[in-house]
Structure formats: structure tokens, C-alpha cells
Amino acid sequence: MKSEQQSAFLIGVVGVCASGKSTLIRGLESRGYRARHIAQEHSYVKDMWKRITNPDVLIFLDASYPVTVKRRQLNWLEADWAEQQRRLSHAREHADLAIQTDQRNADEVLAEVIQFIGEFLAKGQSNTTPQA
């Protein structure tokens, strides 16, 4: 059941292509959370994640180059993946939670995020994403 606090709370999700962002967001939304994909991996503006969405909490999902290629059959070079990592560096530094998804399935990632959000909300924190 969705609580008032939960529905007012905004979760931003960033990460490299094929790291599991869309899957995580669907899982969060199905449980009553507001979550937004922030396409930071495609932006040259290092703090776009903050300017566009300014989430209450920022989740960073990472995946290695070989795993991203396997998951989505992406037609890209390791240099493209490295460029996304570079573009995401500011968001990674400011993330409230960072998860390496190579060895985790979608349910494990979702469970970790929900546990983190529960603890975060229990502490009464909001709008605590560090300032740039």
C-alpha cells in the first residue's frame, strides 16, 4: 500500500545503458514509489540529474562493458561505454546508493533499493542529495 510519504518522495535512477534502470523503475512504480530515469549517460551537462529532476534520493546502477553488451546486444565499443562512465561520474559521486548489477538479478537490485529507501525514509531524510 502506498503511503503519503512514499508517493511524495522522488527517486532518481541513473546508470550506464543496460545496467537495469528501466527494470528497477518499473519495479519501484509497481510498489507505489515515484521513480524517474535520468538520462545522464547521454548528457554532457555533468549535473543534469540534479537540474532536471532534483530527486530526493539518487540511485546509481553500474554494469561492466561485457555485461551491457550481453544484456542488450548493444552495438557499441568499449570506448562508448567508457564515455558513458565519464558522463556519469558526477552522478556517481553524488549518488545516495550505488549498485554494481553484473552479478545481481532484477529482484535482488529492487530489494536492495527498497530496503535502502525504507531506511532513508525512516530517518526522516529528504532532499539531502549533496549539492554540487
Where are these regions (language model features)?
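Conserved phosphate-donor/acceptor-positioning beta-strand/loop module used by diverse small-molecule
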Residues: 54-71, 99
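Conserved glycine(s) of the Walker
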Residues: 20
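Walker A (P-loop) ATP-phosphate-binding motif of ABC ATPase nucleotide-binding domains
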Residues: 10
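Conserved substrate/cofactor phosphate-moiety recognition/catalytic segment
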Residues: 3-6, 16, 26-56
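Conserved Walker
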Residues: 23
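Catalytic phosphate/metal-binding cores of nucleic-acid and nucleotide-processing enzymes, i.e., regions
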Residues: 118
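Small-molecule kinase domains that catalyze NTP-dependent phosphoryl transfer to phosphate-bearing small molecules
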Residues: 74-112, 123-132
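Hydrophobic anchor at the beta1->P-loop junction of P-loop NTPases
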Residues: 13
